[in-house]
């Protein structure tokens, strides 16, 4: 499975660029959460539980990013 990440440096970015990056990251994280959830179904009970807990935390983080987007747009 090929997966590409575009890593960003600590260079200053405009507010518009930051907002675009946040939107991308929220969507990207949501996609990974879906993949992880599906993967959990193939694991042992304890491992699946740990992955589902991780997905929950990832979803919480993604929601914080979405809130930041709303604040920035608002």
Where in the sequence are the language-model features?
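Short, charge-rich amphipathic interface segments used for partner binding and complex assembly
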Residues: 35-71
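N-terminal acidic leader/helix
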Residues: 4-32
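Short, charged, intrinsically disordered terminal tails
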Residues: 3-8, 66-74
């Amino acid at each position: 499975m090929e997966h590409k990440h575009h890593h960003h440096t600590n260079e200053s970015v405009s507010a518009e660029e930051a907002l675009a990056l946040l939107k991308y990251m929220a969507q990207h994280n949501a996609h990974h959460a879906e993949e992880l959830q599906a993967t959990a179904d193939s694991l042992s009970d304890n491992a699946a539980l740990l992955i589902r807990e991780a997905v929950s935390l990832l979803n919480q983080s993604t929601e914080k990013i979405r809130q930041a987007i709303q604040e920035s747009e608002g």
